[in-house]
Amino acid sequence: MEVTSTTFISTTRSSKYLTLTSYSPVILPASTLRRDFLGCCHSLRPSPHLRTRAGKRNSRRSSIRSPRLVVRASIDSGLILIVVAVTAFSAIAFAYCQSTFRKRKSSDEVATVHGGKNSAENRREIHGDIHEGNPVEINVGFRKVEEESVNLLEEEKAHQIHEVAVMDYDSVSAEDSQFAVASVTTVATAHTLIDESFSSSIVNGSVALESATFGVKTPEKQVGNSEDQKGLEHDFSQAVVGIHSIASPQVVDDTRALEYEYNGLLQKPLEYSIFAESKREEIHTFYGSNHSSAKSSRLPSLKAVSPAVTSATNSLFLDHKNNGVIDTQFPGQSSGQATGDVQEENLVAHSNGGVSHIRKDVKGDWKFPSDGKHVGHQIDESMPQFPARNFELHNSNGRSPETSDAYNRLLRDGRIKDCISLLEDLDQRDLLDMDKIYHASFFKACKKQRAVKEAFRFTKLILNPTMSTFNMLMSVCASSQDIEGARGVLRLVQESGMTADCKLYTTLISSCAKSGKVDAMFEVFHQMSNSGVEANLHTFGALIDGCARAGQVAKAFGAYGILRSKNVKPDRVVFNALISACGQSGAVDRAFDVLAEMKAETHPIDPDHISIGALMKACCNAGQVERAKEVYQMIHKYGIRGTPEVYTIAVNSCSKSGDWDFACSIYKDMKEKDVTPDEVFFSALIDVAGHAKMLDEAFGILQDAKSQGIRLGTISYSSLMGACCNAKDWKKALELYEKIKSIKLRPTISTMNALITALCEGNQLPKAMEYLDEIKTLGLKPNTITYSMLMLASERKDDFEVSFKLLSQAKGDGVSPNLIMCRCITSLCKRRFEKACAGGEPVVSFKSGRPQIENKWTSMALMVYRETISGGTVPTTEVVSQVLGCLQLPHDAALRDRLISTLGINISSQKQHNIFPLVDGFGEYDPRAFSLLEEATSLGVLPSVSFNKIPLFFDTTELPKNVAEVYLLTIFKGLKHRLAAGAKIPHINLIISIQEKEIRTPEGEKTIDLTGRVGQEIGALLRRLDIPYHRKDSRLRINGVSLKNWFQPKLDSPFSGGKPGDLRSSQVPLGNQISRQQRSIRLGNLSLE
């Protein structure tokens, strides 16, 4: 059965108003007619509080019925002439728009879909002509009029049209709703009934009403991520709405989900309805295509309702935020297309009735995939078809709404560089309006990503930046700890002619504080004072916080004194910063003084959880664990609920001591105060259990955290692996590692280090080496801790090959030898060197004319030691002693004879020991040992001895064996040079360690003093050198005269025929000459005669 569509226009007269009613088609009875707003597929219903459930059900049922259109308008009879004028003006405007499109060489294409094929016979062009037939076309759009004369004319007519175009609905029509419509054209057929009174205003069966446009300007658009937004501000200053309606006997549900992509961002269209608030009831104003008449006073606001799915009405809406297009499709006809800022649009018919959209934009490519299924309406081929048109839509500044939407999407995704590139591109084309960009959102994104350069580029795009803009830019620099950037902001402020305010200086001070630049911080403060800007409480808080971060408690209290001198009342934040400064420097008593000062204020300030946490940290840094427990009790005293952070600090305070009971009480307090623990707290609790050797409790804590729904990650499992390491249970550690792999959790290097440490402690070095290779397969990089633990295990097993292999791998991975690695290598080298000496291997060479150690183990020890200290590591006395042990000469008769022959002197066999003062190193150590000891003294490893004190004191109680011996020989070497210069030799007092021990004798138990190991070695050294000494209690005394005689041994004179002589008699002329030279220097006689 074929159904034709008929449009009726009827008029009724009242005493004052004419009522015009138009509807099409007449398929349904009048009682079922729905109140539809012109240009919108949603029904206009009363306010939600006036609707009943029955009404809602009726509206849902009515949404699936056949299409019809009802237009009712109440027009004052006195304004009929104005309607005629409006009609004429609309025709002129329409003709002008058509001529504009022709000048732009825009081609009109006719795309008619008939079951998936194009019909060339049905293509017709519409250029202002009125077509016969049943279709009703309603085109609603805003067009831009460029000529100034037309704009002025349209502005004159805007207010008149505003009063004329009023539609009168029934009393149940929706209250407080206004809509923007550009042009209304009703095309009627020959069956249309027209009132005679309106025949003069209708040309060829058409009635046109136009009014002024309106727009809502939103200079700053808030970027949000919520999917349930109920109110959004939109820019509708220019929009195009194309509505085509063709009667059809069928109603087919057609909700097509279009997806398009811009720069890789997937977007989906939304269906929505638009409502605006109004104080007038049952009056809806229609506006025409006049763009120059900007805003109507009767439309105070425009709001968009949240998206809703309306598949029953078979309408398709493109999201205005994405395309700037509202495309409404009535049942029975494919939707007309209207685009914003689009250069080309092609409609391609498919066999299934679908339409493939391909659009090319100015800025980017918007792609509409053709995989979305679209069920087209079956259209009678006899019906005339209207061609789809291409429109270019721009905002008032020539920028497409799609550009702003693209910027907002990029900003939401955190693509700051793409955002700034887009804005700079618009600026080059003179299309950028920074007033419509929300500045705070961009600076906030830069602050999160520490994008200082992008923030400066954004600021340069702002034509007239304010002090608020510079403050936001300074905040970005402060969060990024970029001092140079912060100073650059200050220069920009000065160059712009503005005076920096207190907030800007405070942010700059905070930036210096976060970077640890205390001097720069105070420099800015003095600059601020010299500029006449008064510092406030936040400024002093930033100063004190910077001093606290650097641990400079004196400067922190200095800033506090300035605060007091300026009569600025400190708050809790300032006091907390002072307590933190005291904690960093270990001044616990000073921190408690600050707490007492808080309570002594005129209005006492009670500590909060930050104060308690800072005090507990101060106690922990000073090693006062018991005092930290007392501070924790203040939480109950002051009724502080606290946060997980302060409870974590309390648990960490008892970690080293392994006080499991106190940690459990803290956990209990958290539960009582309903404080939800986080993963960091559970990790600290597991660490305490590990130090307490309670491994089962540690695993129980992990299960407890899971039962509470805490999402556990690498922090918790690393702490649990550390607990296994502390408990020295390598089997549990392996089980835990397998569990970590089973849950597909990627372990960190700290987790693997704890596993390797547990294996090394369990004497499982081969397995530990296997997991070293597995670290690299996991994509992790071994660090210093990894190689240190492995080297310690190899050193305990005396496996030099493994240690040397690890050292080579460490160098390959870019890990420099640290103190532990150096100590392990030097210890292994010393053992092998001593073994070589004991086995009689030749280790001494006389190639240089003096005795020198030449051995591979000594060379290896010296090499690792040099690499360690060259990296900035300060060695310990133990490491220095091990290296010196590799430079000690062996004590055998063969070496002594070789030394005598090298000297080339004759000595009696009874006085062989007197030759040692004449040998470099005194025959005990390689001469390089003295240089190494002097270097260690310069690094602060060993104390220095002053020769100006008489007698000399040398304490050996805290020194290792080799260090004590070389140190004493170094003193002898210095005294020998002083003796050659004519100085007197002082007495030497050596302090050695003494141990008391009880022994049993026939007379009973007695307590005797035993010399320590170092004292015994020094005594043996003096006896080998034949230096007389006297022991009294813990002191060894060497007489200066005896030492002088030892420096001048008696040798056989080469002129006495082998008789022993005195070395002093043969050296008298040389000694007299040296004395004369010294006397001449003292008298100032420097002549060369």
UniProtKB/Swiss-Prot annotation:
Protein name per its UniProtKB record: Pentatricopeptide repeat-containing protein MRL1, chloroplastic
Consequence of gene loss (knockout): No visible phenotype. RuBisCO content only slightly reduced.
Subcellular location: Plastid, Chloroplast
Entry GO CC: chloroplast
Transit peptide: 1-72
GO-annotated biological processes: mRNA stabilization
Keyword Secreted belongs to the record: no
Keywords, alphabetical: Chloroplast, Plastid, Repeat, Transit peptide
Location (main, coarse): plastid
Family, per entry: Belongs to the PPR family. P subfamily.
Family annotation (Gene3D superfamilies): Tetratricopeptide repeat domain
Native source organism of the sequence: Arabidopsis thaliana (Mouse-ear cress)
PPR repeats: 466-500, 501-535, 536-570, 571-605, 608-642, 643-677, 678-712, 713-747, 748-782, 783-817
Tissue-level expression: Expressed in stems, leaves and sepals.
Top-level taxon of the source organism: Eukaryota
Physiological role: Regulator of the large subunit (LS) of RuBisCO. Involved either in the processing or in the stabilization of the processed transcript, probably by acting as a barrier to the 5'>3' degradation.
Gene: MRL1
